[in-house]
Swiss-Prot record:
It holds the Pfam family LRR_4. Residues 215-244 form the IQ domain. Residues 556-616 form a coiled coil. Keywords: Coiled coil, Leucine-rich repeat, Repeat. LRR repeats lie at residues 51-72, 73-94, 98-119. The keyword Cytoplasm does not apply. This is Leucine-rich repeat and IQ domain-containing protein 3.
Length: 633
């Protein structure tokens, strides 16, 4: 719109009134305005921008910001690089309740009293006023920090607790102008930024300020500790409540097998119910999961009497490999189960799908290496029991051809001889053979029962010896562990003493370094102030020289322009005179030509008259001829 300016003639004209009303209606919806470096002198065009949130009006010639009073939704206001010397009153700043970032550096503020009106901004987080005359005053930062309460960052440093709390001396990390509190609150502007980019930049700046305060403000750190303590104290009944560790019981259908482990007179058992008849290769049975608490272990001893125990090292066979039957001990309560399964054939191709044994406690892991060396397991290996009943003798059946031959022999020889005597002899020998077989089997079963009893006694004795040996090993291990712990504690105490000595030396060096650093910082600050003044003086000199050069250039241009105008006027005069001369010469030539033609005609007429006078004699004819000649002339 006319490069951002509208003249009074256009605004007052009747044809432009409707256009101006549309402009005002559009300005009410403006959210983001950026006039950077346009050499503008007033902000009157922003009076109707009610919805304005981000206003960048930097590097101009603005002196009054009162037109922004209607922009009550401002979040960011950038007015640096202008010629503002006074700020509006407190009512102006009370209306800007959403203002969080205010950039006023590089302006002409000179009085602290005028700046204190910024305390009306209830949500102001960041403020910049460096490169202003007021920033060179002694109590500039102290007055601003303690008058604008919500302020968190001033110029290039976040506000420390040392500036707020009087006579509080803090370490170097938390002091004013420390390196940890440095933050570039006004980054370099980027061309082509949109409203979304500016909002993201505002959020980033505020979050960065809060992060620096959270890590470098002792008050906030202590508050965080106290809040954590209160929350933990409030939630401690929920964390200290004892929970029973659930155990998993996996259930399949028919037979009970217990996998148990003895660890310092404590039994932890996982109970499985399996199908011994299942002949499945490489398939996992369907388990039903049940939970039980440690209170259920009270009945484990009674329940253990009625189930069979397996070894800890049950090895399942591979899918295509040979299977090994686990060795287990059959107790008295299993006679009924044993009698039911006597006549069934044992299938050697079954696979037990077992759950993993729960992890051993940390104390039992100490004996793992020793147990590997002596190749001893926690659980005994029991012998495979022999069946209590004898097996049926195998009956040899005759083939069809043998039966046919015997029938033919009996049919042919029956009529010739009596076979009753031979039948009695065969019956006697068969009964005698059967009695011998039964006596041999009875002796074998008696020997097997004796061997089984001897094996049971041997296993119980081996178990007792292994338990006593394990207890002795545990006592020795406890003694060695206690010695090792004492040695470790001594080493730790020596290490802590060395660390304390190093810490004291480090703190002393740190104090010296802090003093040196503070001296260097003070010198750098003084040097930076001096350099800034020198740069400003050089800048003023440069500006004056540039202004003088521009002034001389303007004067030269004016003289050249006047000289050109004089030349043009003289050239016009000369050209007019030349044109007049040419016109006169042409007029003279034309007049001479006309006169010559008239003379020629007169002489021709005279010649004709003489001719007539000489050749025509009659007077009438002469008169008529004279009239015609005169008319012709």
């Amino acid at each position: 719109m006319f490069h951002g300016t509208i003249t009074k003639e256009l605004t007052s004209h009747e044809e432009w009134s409707h256009y101006n009303e549309n402009i005002v209606e559009d300005q009410k919806d403006f959210v983001f305005v950026k006039y950077n470096g346009l050499h503008l002198k007033s902000m009157e065009n922003l009076q109707s921008c009610i919805s304005l949130r981000v206003c960048i009006f930097s590097n101009n010639f603005v002196t009054d910001i009162q037109p922004l009073q209607g922009c009550k939704k401002l979040i960011k206001l950038d007015l640096h690089g202008n010629q503002i010397k006074t700020l509006p009153d407190r009512t102006f700043w009370n209306g800007l309740k959403n203002l969080k970032l205010l950039y006023l550096h590089d302006n002409g503020f000179a009085k602290l009293k005028n700046i204190c009106v910024l305390s009306g901004c209830v949500n102001l987080v960041g403020l910049t006023m460096f490169d202003c005359p007021v920033s060179l005053k002694k109590g500039y930062r102290h007055v601003l920090v303690n008058s604008i309460w919500p302020l968190k960052a001033l110029d290039h440093h976040v506000i420390s607790d040392e500036e707020i709390i009087q006579n509080w001396h803090l370490p170097e990390r938390f002091k004013t102008f420390s390196q940890s509190l440095f933050f570039n609150i006004c980054p370099a502007p980027i061309k082509g930024t949109t409203y979304e980019d500016e909002i993201k930049n505002i959020k980033h700046i505020i979050s960065r300020i809060n992060e620096i305060l959270a890590h470098n403000s002792p008050v906030l750190i202590i508050q965080r500790w106290i809040r954590g303590f209160i929350v933990r104290k409030h939630l401690s009944p929920y964390f200290t409540r004892k929970r029973h560790h659930d155990r998993m019981i996996r259930v399949l259908e028919t037979k009970l097998i217990c996998i148990g482990r003895n660890n310092e007179d404590k039994f932890l058992e996982d109970i499985f119910l399996i199908k011994p008849e299942s002949n499945i290769k490489g398939k996992v049975a369907h388990w039903k999961q049940m939970r039980y608490s440690p209170d259920d272990f009270k009945y484990s001893t009674e329940y253990r009497k009625h189930i069979s125990c397996l070894s800890y090292e049950l090895k399942t066979k591979d899918i295509a490999g040979n299977s090994k039957q686990p060795r287990h001990h059959i107790q008295k309560g299993q006679n009924e189960m044993k009698s039911d399964s006597e006549d069934e054939e044992v299938d050697t191709k079954f696979r037990i799908s077992a759950m993993k044994i729960p992890l051993c406690p940390s104390r039992s892991l100490k004996y793992r290496a020793m147990l590997k060396e002596i190749k001893w397991d926690y659980f005994p290996e029991y012998l495979q029991p022999l069946p209590a009943t004898r097996q049926k003798p195998q009956v040899k059946r005759e083939t069809h051809e043998e039966l046919k031959e015997r029938r033919n022999f009996l049919a042919s020889q029956r009529a010739g001889m009596d076979l009753h005597l031979f039948n009695d002899i065969d019956k006697y020998y068969s009964e005698q053979r059967q009695q011998e077989e039964e006596a041999r089997k009875f002796a074998a079963t008696a020997a097997a029962q004796v061997a089984q009893e001897r094996a049971r006694l041997n296993t119980s004795e081996n178990l007792r010896k292994k338990i006593s040996m394990a207890r002795k090993l545990m006592q020795k291990d406890n003694e060695t562990i206690q010695k090792g712990l004492r040695h470790i504690w001594k080493e730790r105490l020596n290490y802590l003493e060395k660390v304390r000595e190093r810490k004291s030396m480090f703190l002393a060096e740190k104090k010296l370094n802090a003093a040196d650093q503070s001296l260097v910082l003070s010198l750098n600050n003084e040097r930076s102030i001096l350099l800034r003044g020198i740069i400003q003086v050089d800048k003023l000199k440069r500006d004056l020289s540039e202004m003088k050069a521009k002034h001389f250039d303007v004067i030269e241009k004016r003289e050249k322009r006047k000289y050109k105008q004089n030349l043009l006027t003289e050239m016009k005069k000369l050209r007019a005179e030349e044109i007049h001369k040419r016109h006169c010469e042409e007029r003279f030539v034309i007049d001479t030509l006309i006169f010559q033609k008239g003379c020629e005609r007169l002489e021709e007429a005279k010649a004709k008259v003489e001719f007539i006078n000489t050749y025509y004699t009659s007077k009438s004819h002469k008169k008529y001829h004279n009239k015609t000649m005169l008319n012709h002339i």
